[in-house]
Amino acid sequence: MIKIVFICIILLYISFLCKHQIKEFFDPDSTNDSTNNSTNILGTKLEICSTDPMTGFHRKGYCKTGPEDKGTHTVCATVTDEFLEFTKSMGNDLSTPRDNFPGLKDGDKWCLCELRWQQGVHNGYITDVDLKATNSKTRPSIRYEIEALNLQEFLQEELNILKNKIF
């Protein structure tokens, strides 16, 4: 019985995530539509990532992008000290204050370059991602990676709840 409930929870969560992405899966060019720039990867209105520190390629708090944003800064993530050290070692120092930039510290939310976020994950530096503030313009392959990590976290939480109810 518990297995059936657990499987149903998984299927509901997957269908929720996939509901908004079927079009992009079959038509990847649909993500180039300028109207998608204001939606998140869940298909709803893009929420603000951070105003303290002020983030976003255009420094308006949102992970919006455009042709001038060569790094595609669309992933809203909470950075860790470990991730900041990693990105510094890769040539992108986000922790040192500079002109009009306070420098990031552990726990700050920031619009990350999608490929740098992916490099961090592949090197073991996983950061929490705010799905509601991560832009739908994020590449589908990276979006699926983000969702897989969030699904894993969600399932672990559900499993812990079920364990507590049983024992």
Feature locations, PLM:
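Short, basic/aromatic beta-hairpin or loop at an interaction surface
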Residues: 77-93
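Short, compositionally biased
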Residues: 117-140
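Glycine- and charge-enriched low-complexity intrinsically disordered segments
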Residues: 136-167
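Extended boundary segments
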Residues: 26-29, 33-82
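Short alpha-helix capping/helix-loop boundary micro-motifs
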Residues: 93-100
